[in-house]
C-alpha cells in the first residue's frame, strides 16, 4: 500500500492511498475512488495532480 497524507491551509487532512490489486494500484482520496495507476511513479504523479487541483491558491 502507498500512502500520502496532505493538509490544506485550513488544516483539513486528505489521505491519498494506493492499494495494490491485480498488478495495479487503485488510488483513493479519503477512501473515495480517484484513479488507477501502474506503479509508484504514477502514484506520485497523481499525488502532485491532487495537490494542484485541491490545494491551489
Language-model segments: what does each one mean?
Residues 7, 11-48:
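Acidic, low-complexity, intrinsically disordered interaction modules
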Amino acid at each position: 500500500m502507498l500512502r500520502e497524507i496532505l493538509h490544506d491551509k485550513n488544516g483539513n487532512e486528505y489521505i491519498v492511498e494506493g492499494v495494490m490489486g491485480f498488478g495495479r494500484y487503485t488510488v483513493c482520496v479519503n477512501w473515495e475512488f480517484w484513479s488507477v495507476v501502474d506503479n509508484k511513479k504514477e502514484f506520485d504523479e497523481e499525488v502532485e495532480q491532487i495537490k494542484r487541483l485541491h490545494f491551489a491558491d
